[in-house]
Amino acid sequence: MAKEIKFDMESRDLLKKGVDALANAVKVTLGPKGRNVILSKTYGAPHITKDGVSVAKEIELECPFENMGAQLVKEVASKTNDDAGDGTTTATILAQSIIGVGLKNVTAGANPMDLKRGIDKAVKAVVTHIAGMAKEVGDDFQKIEHVAKISANGDENIGSLIAEAMRKVKKEGVITVEEAKGTDTTVEVVEGMQFDRGYISPYFVTNTDKMEVQMENPFILIYDKKISVLKEMLPILEQTVQTGKPLLIIAEDIDSEALATLVVNRLRGSLKICAVKAPGFGDRRKAMLEDIAILTGGTVISEETGLKLENATMDMLGTAEKVTVDKDNTTIVNGAGNKEGIASRITQIKAQIENTTSDYDREKLQERLAKLAGGVAVLYVGAASEVEMKEKKDRVEDALSATRAAIEEGTVPGGGTAYIRAIAALEGLKGENEDETTGIEIVKRAIEEPLRQIVANAGKEGAVVVQKVKEGKDDFGYNARTDVFENLYSTGVIDPAKVTRVALENAASIAGMFLTTECVIADKKEDNPAAPAMPGGMGGMGGMM
């Protein structure tokens, strides 16, 4: 396919048009008085959102050159979302500002490479300043609530629910977001370990109203292979029957013949039993079975370690205070594993989290850690309509990411104030030549933009507010929600330092690429592509009736 090539100013102007198209759509969502954006969907109702990255992801422009500009800034939003989970709109605004002012300077004859060096120098200074300003969150759940509220666009209910979930499961715990059946947004905590495997047969159910298997003080048999014939299990079954306690079997699978025998005995009342499949796949399954064994004080019966099912003894079985199994999940509460064993397993998983490079593996390890250490909280998001539910779920996920970021690197004054305070770090900073110093000035101007935009979205005059905030010190800033200048820490207008840092780093990184671009190549559009030829006739079928 033929290519179209644009050089120099022409290429940069087209890219900038794309940047502005995307950034202008995204930046209206910033701040407590940010506006909604409605996204048309091919199927179903339109999606209403105030989430910057959701807006950015929807944007595709017709002109391939403009589209490239938009896609580059989309990358800023996505990367910031991946790294910090929030701050996508801020990153987009910063990128637009650095690119806009930077291109004017390049057009006026500045050296793009020197500008980029100056920008990088300034960003480094600002990031160091932000780190110095950051205050640790620790176990201050009020701060966590404030961060969550700000990130959820000022929704106090979401803020308090996330703080409650964090309080219940601590830092190690996992918090997941699900859609609720009703209109209320609630938080539920699953104590103990839960994994996503339910009973193999509904005939094991003990509570028919809830369709659940409920067991008090059961023994737990953990086997890493398929149980093909019941004969292998008979010795251990006979021993558990004599104790009169129920038995939970966790195995890779159970053959239909062996399962039928267990079900018949369960229905006769001679066995209190339930069987579930082992969670996970491959190596992760082995690790999860080992976790369950450590939590319940049992042993994984595995031929790899020289143990056979027919030789299993009672001391290889784990125990727990209570086990609940429904059609989808198994929950083990208060396993009888010893505290030292669980603690060393937790340390081991934490070390694996540190060393892994895969985000997917990290997420799965984090889940395993939560199941052993803190428990799992589920935030059920409810709303009157599906459209509202999706919008609310976006905000809850943002708020959750922001609180995690705040716990990691602390908090700074919100509402764009942290950037205004960081201008002080650039005051005496000079580059090695004039263009580098211009690069520093570009960043100095750009970091005012988030506050200007928050103020503009609140319907006020940006320049006046920025000047007044500059005159103040520390956490003195503008609260756009109440239209008051005040100390932002005391009123809970705070942002995670990590989000503030990542937004600027990613914006400057893409902007630097932009300014140093000299040529853009895209596919050439064909004016009138020829219509495809009609398929041939159905010759040779004349004899059919």
Curated annotation (Swiss-Prot):
Residues involved in ATP binding: T29, L30, G31, P32, K50, D86, G87, T88, T89, T90, G415, D495
| Keyword set, alphabetical order | ATP-binding, Chaperone, Cytoplasm, Isomerase, Nucleotide-binding
Catalytic activities: ATP + H2O + a folded polypeptide = ADP + phosphate + an unfolded polypeptide
Q: Which GO terms describe its molecular function?
A: ATP binding; ATP-dependent protein folding chaperone; isomerase activity; unfolded protein binding
- Report the EC number(s), separated by commas if there are several: 5.6.1.7
Indicate whether DNA repair appears among the record's keywords.
Answer: no
PROSITE patterns cross-referenced by the UniProt entry: CHAPERONINS_CPN60
| CDD domains per record | GroEL
InterPro entries in the record: Chaperonin_Cpn60_CS, Cpn60/GroEL, Cpn60/GroEL/TCP-1, GroEL-like_apical_dom_sf, GROEL-like_equatorial_sf, TCP-1-like_intermed_sf
Organism's domain of life?
Bacteria
GO-annotated cellular components: cytoplasm
- Sequence intervals crossing the membrane: none
Q: What class of enzyme is it?
A: isomerase
Q: Which Pfam families match?
A: Cpn60_TCP1
Subcellular location(s): the record lists:
Cytoplasm
Keyword Cell membrane found: no
Q: In its UniProt record, which GO terms are filed under biological process?
A: protein refolding
* PANTHER family per the UniProt record, alphabetical: 60 KDA HEAT SHOCK PROTEIN, MITOCHONDRIAL
Task of the protein: Together with its co-chaperonin GroES, plays an essential role in assisting protein folding. The GroEL-GroES system forms a nano-cage that allows encapsulation of the non-native substrate proteins and provides a physical environment optimized to promote and accelerate protein folding.
**Assembly behavior:** Forms a cylinder of 14 subunits composed of two heptameric rings stacked back-to-back. Interacts with the co-chaperonin GroES.
Task: Spell out the family assignment given in the record's similarity comment.
Answer: Belongs to the chaperonin (HSP60) family.
Protein name (record) = Chaperonin GroEL
Originating organism: Porphyromonas gingivalis (strain ATCC 33277 / DSM 20709 / CIP 103683 / JCM 12257 / NCTC 11834 / 2561)
Identify the coding gene. groEL
